[in-house]
Amino acid sequence: MLPARPEPLSVAVEETAVVVVDMQNAYASPGGYLDIAGFDISGAKAAISAIAETVEAARAAGVTVIYFQNGWDKDYVEAGGPGSPNWHKSNALKTMRKKPELQGQLLAKGGWDYALVDQLAPQPGDIVVPKPRYSGFFNSQFDSILRARGIRNLVFCGIATNVCVESTLRDGFHLEYFGILLEDATHQAGPEYVQKAAIYNVETFFGWVSTVADFRRAFAQIPPKED
């Protein structure tokens, strides 16, 4: 049983995955896209440490670990042109239009910005899922990966709470997945109030909210699944 708000949730190891959302240099490192675009990334360091604890506990318990990587091809065809809302709303794309010297650097596959941070390198058995939009369910193999493994419970951590994390958790709700947000293993893009708003939305409408400590305790009590 995982302690959570608004109530505890029963989670079986074989039906659970930890979903690490967009822990890339773009979102968590100085000189990455969010930093260049003017967002406060000071909370990213704590999030990295908390996520490292989470995935360590997950692997020890036999819980599937899935990483998202957000971005596009180096020519940004996958990002969409002026006919796409993403072209207008993506702060990475807007930043590159304002600063043409950055063209081809932000969230481009194969580049430093796109890469996962060194502290959270995937391990053997982990799954990495590329995604081209905020929600990890859109135009990706994520749903198929989950259904093939019988996974129903998604434990979310990563950046940004109010954008890609919440977008994916919401879509999961509509696809009948149980979404759990580890509030102390996330960081928002924007002021502190958007973090609180995202947590409120999850707890009240779309899922459950827990902590890294509660996750670690809950899964330490569950024997690892056998191969």
From Swiss-Prot:
InterPro entries in the record: Isochorismatase-like_dom, Isochorismatase-like_hydrls, Isochorismatase-like_sf, RutB
One of the record's GO molecular function terms: hydrolase activity, acting on carbon-nitrogen (but not peptide) bonds, in linear amides
Active-site residues (renumbered): 22, 131, 164
GO BP, sorted A to Z: nitrogen utilization; uracil catabolic process
Broad class of enzyme this protein falls into: hydrolase
Reaction(s) catalysed (UniProt annotation): (Z)-3-ureidoacrylate + H2O + H(+) = (Z)-3-aminoacrylate + NH4(+) + CO2; (Z)-3-ureidoacrylate + H2O = (Z)-3-aminoacrylate + carbamate + H(+); (Z)-2-methylureidoacrylate + H2O + H(+) = (Z)-2-methylaminoacrylate + NH4(+) + CO2
HAMAP family, sorted: RutB (MF_00830)
Function: Hydrolyzes ureidoacrylate to form aminoacrylate and carbamate. The carbamate hydrolyzes spontaneously, thereby releasing one of the nitrogen atoms of the pyrimidine ring as ammonia and one of its carbon atoms as CO2.
Similarity comment text for this entry: Belongs to the isochorismatase family. RutB subfamily.
Name of this protein: Ureidoacrylate amidohydrolase RutB
Lineage: Bacteria, Pseudomonadati, Pseudomonadota, Alphaproteobacteria, Hyphomicrobiales
Gene: rutB
